[in-house]
Curated annotation (Swiss-Prot):
One of its GO terms (biological process) is L-methionine salvage from methylthioadenosine. Coiled coil: none annotated. Pathway: Amino-acid biosynthesis; L-methionine biosynthesis via salvage pathway; L-methionine from S-methyl-5-thio-alpha-D-ribose 1-phosphate: step 1/6. This is Methylthioribose-1-phosphate isomerase. The keyword Transferase does not apply.
């Protein structure tokens, strides 16, 4: 059985509440844009691709059964909702780019006098629904492209390391970095996968471990602080992580802890790959210094499962992401191939 983080059909949207995993698997309804914003902000759904899809599908739910007198009224409502949704989590670029695409489509339909109000609404709904389908096909391509690079010239199974959660729970299905690992396993060339717990929100322990156990992959959970010791004591063939935003020069914002893994990988001579769809690449940002880093509430650091683990009164710094410099990245695995960071901007412009 395939894991589904997102269930959608005919204007009805449900998401798997990832705050409850792995103890409980519960789907919750998303009845409109406010629910979508809340689910994204509270991290009931997370992962840059999934955030974009849920955000846009919540817009579909919002407008699905409504009637509009004019195309302008529909366009204004869509614009307001999209502007609101992109404030839910600022670092992941996928939702912003998806919102920009929808806005561009709306402007085009608004200018086309042959398109009716209902026709305009249906075209927008159709385009957003296609995002769900396309994300899965893109992830499959990312998995294949990554596996091709990792197994090239290798005559033995691989040991791989990943961080945070980049699988079916972070996307429409299959996953990005975890999709690469799945693809390696499908070729019977995966010896073992290690996943970090990913403090402070424990997406690795709660979600990635959940997916690995579900898929019956040979896997071991380690703490974030064990990565250097792991690379030093056991032969790790490659590290594969996801991305929430990739700048034009290849600098990559991903879950906090990614940067230190890349530094340690460089020291030990372990290839460090980023797996991300083109929707995570933001060529409008020159380099990582311009990426806005979201800071999360203190209680996410001081509490686990509602129980305080830190001394009351201690100050906290809780950035959700860090930026890995492009020079530490071996390659960026996309649905259109594996690229060197310096090749990104040109490849995106060729779309």
């Amino acid at each position: 059985m395939t894991l589904e983080a997102i269930k959608y059909k005919s204007g009805q949207l449900q998401i798997l509440d990832q705050l409850l995993l792995p103890a409980e698997s519960k789907y919750i309804p998303v009845a409109g844009v406010k629910d979508g914003w809340s689910a994204i902000h509270k991290m009931q759904v997370r992962g840059a691709p999934a955030i974009a899809i849920v955000g846009c599908l919540s817009l579909v739910v919002e407008i699905y059964d409504k009637q509009y007198e004019t195309k302008a009224a529909l366009a204004n409502e869509i614009g307001e909702h999209l502007q609101y949704l992109v404030t839910s989590r600022p670092t992941a670029v996928n939702l912003k780019l998806a919102a920009d695409d929808v806005k561009g489509q709306v402007e085009s339909l608004l200018a086309n006098e042959t398109v009716t109000v209902d026709g305009m609404k249906q075209e927008v709904i159709k385009a957003i629904e296609y995002m769900l389908e396309k994300d899965i096909s893109d992830n499959r391509a990312i998995g294949d492209n990554g596996a091709n690079v990792l197994v090239k010239g290798v005559d033995r199974p691989l040991k791989l390391l990943t961080h945070c959660n980049t699988g079916s729970l972070a996307t429409a299905g299959y996953g990005t970095a975890l999709g690469v690992i799945r693809s390696v396993n499908e070729r019977n060339l995966l010896e073992h996968v290690y996943c970090t717990e990913t403090r402070p929100y424990n997406q690795g322990a709660r979600l990635t471990a959940y997916e690995l156990v579900h898929d019956k992959l040979p896997a071991t959970l380690v703490t974030d602080s064990m990565v250097a010791a792991l690379l030093n004591s056991r032969k790790i063939d490659a590290i594969i992580v996801g991305a929430d935003r990739v700048a034009a020069n290849g600098d990559t914002a991903n879950k906090i802890g990614t940067y230190q893994m890349a530094v340690v990988a460089k020291h030990h001579g372990v290839p460090f790959y980023v797996a991300a769809p083109f929707t995570s690449i933001d060529v409008a940002i020159e380099d990582g210094s311009h990426i806005k880093i979201e800071e999360r509430p203190e209680h996410e650091l001081t509490h686990i499962g509602g129980q305080r683990i830190a001394a009351p009164g201690i100050g906290c710094w809780n950035p959700a992401f860090d930026v890995t410099p492009a020079e530490l990245i071996t390659g960026i695995i996309t649905e259109r191939g594996v690229l060197k960071p310096c090749e990104l901007a040109e490849k995106v412009r060729q779309k």
